[in-house]
């Protein structure tokens, strides 16, 4: 032990606890090490351990442990226990003033345990509370999970993400430690509530609303649609809140009524002419087909690559099914999730020359985990994907960012750098691109969001009366991707309340990475392969040099110095995100001007 320490006894005890924490590989190592260093460096002699609270790293709990240790040491060695400095000062002041001792404070009652809403302990207590209070038999783990899962936002069987190993079931340990639950039986363990556990469960049950907690159900009030999941509900007023999703505003006076979405409608579908109260769109030359509200159902479509892990590919679809949503899983050319209107009559669209019976809705989700977002920023996919989303013509793009554990030391330079990168990416996505950014805690939170969005779109397009109209742009009247975007822009400007779209197969062809690419598209994609060349910068270069050949020939006409500065000099009048510096100009010249 260091002879220079002013309080060697206290230092020795802290060292003992530090060594014990290291042996147990406990998280307390950091706490004890900090306290040890502070005590070792302190030049003051403490008469009582409570005086050590003034040191960095020594809090009330640690000082209390030191006091207990000192008390035991004094008793063992027949020494008087030093008086607490505050009590000594108070008794001295009292004796000086001749005033009686004030009454002792009543000990503060420990607060009753209250688990967080829809947490693991919360769900387990409610699951066990389904038993009769006087029942002698408990529930097995499998039985309890089945009853508790509807009350919990996290899964009892699968970790929140592949990098973690705990599930909501791990919270059973907390309930056992607090003696709210007891287990009995071997080898098949059964669980039941103790008397204290029943008291907590009864308090929780008083806060529960009526109804089935295992469904995402619609409940309509005056002017409000409530999409409920358990006892946590997201209220979506008829003017759609951005907390649920971006999008057009609905009429506040709409009364929401439940409609059957099973598509068993025997009545023939009648086409509504688009000249009802509107002028024909002569200048566009397009005649959209209006789909009646009762002629289709809303279907969620997921990309085949949207999986929980390589060994658990059906987790997302299975969890959505539990919430009453049966998704379609197929390869998507763009985005990770989207919604289509599937016609109840499979032959309805074929009479207009369409090869598909599904019409795209104006909503698409691009899902990114934190680690995937960082990777896409580094390799340029982030800007390329946003560029393709912008060219897709989809009006409501939801950029969903899912939290994920990233192994970096908090406070390190790399962690700070990555945090800045993500903050900048999120801000640019919202401000520059105008996309709605939704952040979720984990995959289960993402699944709940997709379910709520599906119900919201069903309400918008399928309920009677519908708040939104869906119109199909015939594929035969579109000649290219550019004509599709131009047509969309003009139709939306003419009637913003109508959703104009194309069939799913047409949309897939228009947004394909390889099919129907013009020379301009190929040139832009080639430019964006260079790190630092965003979609905006690529467009600026393409406007100045129309083709790759023209771009290369421009380099060939210059000497080496001229090639390095060519892009910078020819585009230096540009401002904002389109502006290119000399470093980027040289990088482009190294790629495109080599051998000129």
UniProtKB/Swiss-Prot annotation:
Native species: Aspergillus fumigatus (strain ATCC MYA-4609 / CBS 101355 / FGSC A1100 / Af293)
Domain ERCC4 as annotated: residue spans: 299-405
Keywords: DNA damage, DNA recombination, DNA repair, Endonuclease, Hydrolase, Magnesium, Meiosis, Metal-binding, Nuclease, Nucleus
Location within or outside the cell: Nucleus
Similarity comment: Belongs to the XPF family.
Subunit and partners: Interacts with eme1.
Gene: mus81
InterPro entries: DNA_pol_lamdba_lyase_dom_sf, EME1/EME2_C, ERCC4_domain, Mus81, Restrct_endonuc-II-like, WH-like_DNA-bd_sf, WH_MUS81, XPF_nuclease_Mus81
Identification of the protein by name: Crossover junction endonuclease mus81
């Amino acid at each position: 032990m260091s002879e220079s320490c002013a309080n060697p006894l206290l230092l020795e005890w802290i060292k003992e606890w530090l060594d014990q924490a290291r042996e147990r590989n406990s998280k307390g190592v950091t706490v004890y090490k900090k306290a040890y260093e502070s005590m070792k460096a302190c030049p003051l002699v403490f008469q009582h351990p409570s005086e050590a609270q003034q040191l960095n790293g020594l809090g009330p709990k640690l000082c209390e442990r030191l006091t207990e240790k000192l008390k035991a040491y004094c008793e063992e060695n027949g020494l008087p226990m030093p008086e607490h400095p505050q009590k000594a000062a108070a008794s001295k002041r009292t004796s000086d003033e001749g005033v009686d001792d004030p009454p002792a404070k009543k000990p503060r009652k420990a607060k009753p345990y209250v688990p967080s809403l829809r947490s693991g302990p919360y769900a387990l207590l409610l699951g066990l509370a389904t038993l009769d209070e006087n029942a002698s038999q408990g529930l097995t783990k499998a039985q309890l999970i089945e009853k508790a899962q509807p009350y919990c936002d996290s899964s009892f069987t699968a970790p929140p993400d592949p990098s973690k190993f705990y599930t909501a079931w791990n919270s059973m340990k907390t309930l056992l430690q607090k003696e709210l639950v007891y287990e009995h039986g071997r080898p098949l363990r059964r669980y039941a509530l103790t008397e204290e556990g029943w008291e907590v469960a009864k308090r929780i049950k008083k806060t529960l609303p009526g109804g089935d907690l295992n469904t995402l159900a619609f409940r309509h009030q005056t002017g409000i649609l409530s999409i409920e999941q358990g006892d946590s509900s997201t209220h979506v007023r008829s003017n759609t809140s951005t907390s649920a999703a971006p999008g057009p505003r609905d009429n506040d006076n709409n009364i929401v009524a439940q409609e059957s979405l099973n598509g068993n409608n025997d009545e023939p579908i009648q086409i509504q002419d688009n000249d009802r109260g509107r002028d024909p769109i002569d200048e566009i030359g397009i005649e959209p087909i209006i789909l009646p509200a009762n002629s289709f159902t809303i279907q969620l479509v997921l990309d085949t690559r949207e999986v929980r892990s390589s060994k658990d590919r059906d987790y997302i679809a299975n969890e959505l099914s539990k919430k009453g949503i049966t998704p379609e899983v197929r390869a998507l050319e763009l985005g990770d999730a989207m919604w289509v209107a599937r016609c109840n009559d499979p032959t309805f669209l074929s009479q207009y020359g369409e090869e598909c019976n599904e019409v795209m809705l104006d909503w698409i989700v691009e899902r990114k985990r934190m680690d995937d977002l960082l990777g896409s920023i580094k390799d340029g996919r982030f800007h390329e994907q946003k560029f393709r989303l912008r060219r897709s013509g989809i009006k409501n793009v939801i950029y969903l960012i899912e939290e994920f554990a990233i192994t970096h030391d908090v406070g390190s330079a790399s962690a700070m750098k990555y945090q800045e990168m993500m903050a900048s990416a999120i801000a640019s996505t919202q401000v520059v691109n105008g996309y709605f950014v939704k952040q979720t805690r984990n995959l289960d939170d993402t699944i709940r969001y997709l379910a709520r969005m599906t119900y919201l779109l069903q309400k918008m397009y399928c309920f009677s009366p519908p708040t939104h109209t869906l119109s199909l742009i015939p594929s035969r009247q579109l000649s290219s991707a550019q004509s599709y975007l131009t047509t969309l822009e003009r139709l939306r400007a003419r009637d913003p309340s109508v959703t104009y779209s194309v069939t799913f197969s047409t949309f897939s062809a228009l947004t394909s990475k390889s099919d129907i690419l013009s020379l301009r598209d190929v040139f832009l994609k080639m430019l964006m392969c260079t790190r630092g060349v965003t979609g905006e910068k690529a467009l600026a270069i393409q406007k100045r040099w129309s083709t790759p050949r023209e771009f290369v020939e421009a380099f060939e006409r210059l000497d080496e110095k001229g090639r390095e500065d060519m892009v910078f000099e020819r585009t230096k009048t540009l401002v904002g995100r389109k502006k290119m510096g000399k470093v980027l100009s040289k990088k482009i010249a190294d790629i495109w001007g080599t051998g000129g």
